[in-house]
Design a protein with these regions (language model features):
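Residues at the starts of beta-strands that form the adenosine-phosphate
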Residues: 2, 32-35, 73
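Short, glycine-rich nucleotide/cofactor-binding loops
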Residues: 3-18, 46-50
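Short, conserved beta-strand edge motifs with alternating hydrophobic and charged residues
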Residues: 5-6, 35-39
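Histidine-anchored nucleotide/phosphate-binding helix
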Residues: 17-30, 34-36
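Short beta-alpha junction loops
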Residues: 40-43, 80-81
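N-terminal beta-loop-helix "entrance" segment that forms/cooperates
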Residues: 42-56
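A glycine-rich helix N-cap at a beta->alpha junction
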Residues: 52-80
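C-terminal structural segments of small proteins and small subunits
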Residues: 84-86, 90-115
Length: 118
């Protein structure tokens, strides 16, 4: 099964990205393919310069680990990146700047789509 997850809120203000990561982990354990589409403020979580304190979760690193396992992609709204001053050299390895055409394709091709937006 192909699962699409869209997140729209900042990574450390709300727990939507944590929820998306947990859903992705569970789905991948069952052999499903997961695509995460980051829109609006959620694009901040792909900034590899984020340095959370020792006791907090490192969301960018968690996304890298999921991509390394396979069957997991991260797409980032390019306009949202530009709006927030995030450049391609700042984003985590493996993530893909994309846009609304890719989101539309994801909606058309996935079996399930989850939208997390606080």
């Amino acid at each position: 099964m192909k699962i699409g997850i869209q997140v729209m809120v900042p990574p450390y203000t709300y727990e939507d990205l944590d929820t998306a990561i947990k859903i992705a982990e569970a789905a991948m354990e069952k052999g499903h393919e997961v695509t995460l589409f980051l829109f609006a403020d959620s694009v901040i979580c792909t900034n590899k310069n984020i340095k959370p304190i020792r006791i907090d979760r490192n969301i960018p690193q968690k996304l890298v680990e999921l991509m390394q396992k396979g069957n997991f992609e991260v797409h980032i709204c390019g306009i949202c990146m530009d709006y927030r001053g995030i450049t391609t050299d700042m984003i985590i390895d493996g993530s893909k700047p994309s846009g609304l055409p890719e989101l539309a394709n994801l909606l058309a091709t996935c079996d399930r789509f989850i939208n997390l937006m606080a």
